[in-house]
Regions:
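Hydrophobic alpha-helical segments with transmembrane-like composition
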Residues: 64, 71-74, 103-110, 119-199, ...
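Transmembrane alpha-helical segments and their boundary/interface "anchor" motifs
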Residues: 54, 58-61, 75-147, 161, ...
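Membrane-interface helix-boundary motifs at transmembrane edges
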Residues: 9-13, 76-85, 168-180, 232-245, ...
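Alpha-helical transmembrane segments and terminal signal-anchor/GPI-anchor hydrophobic tails
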Residues: 237-314
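C-terminal "closing" transmembrane helix and its immediate cytosolic amphipathic cap
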Residues: 1-8, 300-317, 328-379
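Interfacial loop-to-helix transition and helix-capping segments at the boundaries
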Residues: 49-61, 142-157, 198-225, 259-294
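Membrane-interface transmembrane-helix boundary segments in multi-pass integral membrane proteins
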Residues: 54, 249-251, 276-287, 340-361
Length: 379
């Protein structure tokens, strides 16, 4: 996610920078809706506009993973060199920010703030200001994120993809285009698994109480997006504007409708389980792929001619990892600010997204400009 490697001709692919810019905007937008409190989520305005806005932004993570595949596959370095370079740039800021987030509640107690201030920043967290709780969460970092660092789920995923890429690259280097297509087709079938397990049978294609790895397990997950990004860029797959309009737009609309109406129907049920609430928002599903692919193809066609715009997009692209790590510090205050505005809910969400992205990007850019230490902190 962080590093923008050169591709073939040793020139920066600004199209991928644009995709990363769109992805980070979408991610910020998703989290602006996530910060709505449990009480507010029961209100009709959230069920409608939160679903409408949040559904539109689901391609964020798949877009990031596709860019990662496009830039880094196949890995050309030795396994040790790749891990030393990539993982260190990822793991160090991940640990720094994970520790800081988990110390935040304890620090608010030291400063004399009420425990309720914690929920101004982390709506879903238990407001515990004890050092014991903070220490427990820090010790659990090697195993999973806490409710004070929810966004770090993606970093665990990214570390896993980085560990996997040198191994995956060995196959990619010798795989023909048809073999790559075969993998993508099988992966596409695996995208239906979440719905089949929910609406058909829990135990599917060999899964049972003693085996969680079913028939398509080895082709499933985000590695499909990883390969898809590589496949499109390195095989120079392009589509005409006409095909984008007649195929891409309907594809996006159908994917969006499935996501929106599915999520809205789930959130309308009182006491619905978290698993069902998130079902239609699951990233590795056909509806999210249907939204992601047209966006990736569209912004690959856009040419940025303005040096000012290009410079701005590249700056944001370089700051994406830092934005991901740090934006939760500013999310609560930004949301509290827009709550006071007398404007439509949809407008509030857009304002919150733009404000949060602007503040966080500026913060990350300034810290990175301080030198090597700043870049280690922000990635």
């Amino acid at each position: 996610m962080k590093d923008l490697s050169v591709i073939e001709n040793e020139k920066r692919n600004v199209g991928l920078d644009v995709v990363k810019f769109i992805a980070i905007f979408m991610m910020i937008a998703v989290h602006c809706t996530d910060n709505v409190s449990p009480a507010e989520r029961s209100q009709p305005w959230y069920n409608l506009w939160g679903s409408f806005y949040g559904s539109f932004m689901r391609p964020a993570i798949p877009l990031f993973v596709m860019v990662t595949g496009a830039l880094l596959l196949p890995v050309k370095q030795s396994l040790s060199d790749f891990y030393a370079k990539r993982l260190s740039r990822l793991v160090v800021p991940f640990l720094v920010w994970s520790v800081l987030y988990n110390l935040f509640p304890w620090i608010t107690g030291l400063l004399g703030f009420s425990p309720s201030v914690i929920n101004d920043f982390f709506v879903w967290a238990v407001p515990d200001q004890s050092f014991t709780s903070a220490l427990h969460n820090i010790l659990m970092i090697p195993f999973n994120f806490s409710m004070y660092a929810v966004q770090m789920w993606y970093v665990y995923l990214l570390i896993g993809l980085y560990l996997y890429m040198p191994v995956f690259s060995a196959w990619i280097r010798q795989a023909s285009v048809n073999e790559q297509r075969f993998f993508i087709v099988i992966w596409f079938i695996s995208l239906f698994v979440p719905y089949l397990r929910e609406f058909l049978t829990k135990d599917l294609w060999g899964t049972c109480s003693w085996n969680e790895f079913g028939l398509f397990y080895y082709f499933s997950g985000f590695n499909g997006y990883l390969l898809l990004g590589y496949y499109i860029i390195h095989n120079r797959i392009t589509v005409s504007w006409k095909k984008l309009f007649w195929i891409g737009v309907p594809l996006f609309v159908v994917g969006y409708c499935i996501t929106f109406f599915g999520f809205k129907s789930m959130t309308a049920v009182p006491g619905q389980s978290v698993e069902l609430v998130e079902l239609f928002f699951t990233y590795c599903t056909p509806n999210v792929l249907m939204m992601t692919l047209p966006i990736f193809m569209l912004f690959q066609k856009i040419r940025v001619n303005s040096d000012i715009v290009k410079h701005f997009v590249v700056i944001v692209s370089k700051c994406t990892l830092g934005i991901w790590m740090s934006h939760y510090l500013f999310l609560g205050p930004c949301y509290m600010f827009i709550e006071s505005l007398s404007v439509h809910t949809m407008v509030k969400l857009v304002i919150c997204t733009v404000l949060l992205l602007s503040i966080t990007c500026t913060f990350v850019y300034i810290v990175r400009r301080t030198g090597k230490l700043g870049r280690w902190i922000m990635g």
